[in-house]
């Protein structure tokens, strides 16, 4: 699939390789939050492993060199429900959101802490509590981004029960 602009906003489309026929998989209308008249301006997106959900990255902000902070939304394909993640967290503060292997959760970083959000209920669980000025969880500092091209510092376990992550204490650095 690919992201294309239309008169009404961003659309996600697929092309049949043999015929070149274009099919809109997700319309701009489906990407319009309830009560709004404009669709989300998508910077990036990823499908869940079973293609039943779409994770959309929007409203992005730069951290060091790249737009890695922003807002994330999930579109459930079965019922067309569009839900913003991270309710109660600061606008454009989420980073590196990713589906759990079974697609029932999304984990992300906000203000140097890692969170997990259950998609069926919207319940958000803060997994790390010590993130702040000198403690970084689930992402990297400037040196890692600049010298090693590392930005995203956490991964789901294959069974989706755990998250492995980088933890840095930059005090005195």
Predicted regions and their residues:
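Beta-propeller folds
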Residues: 1-173
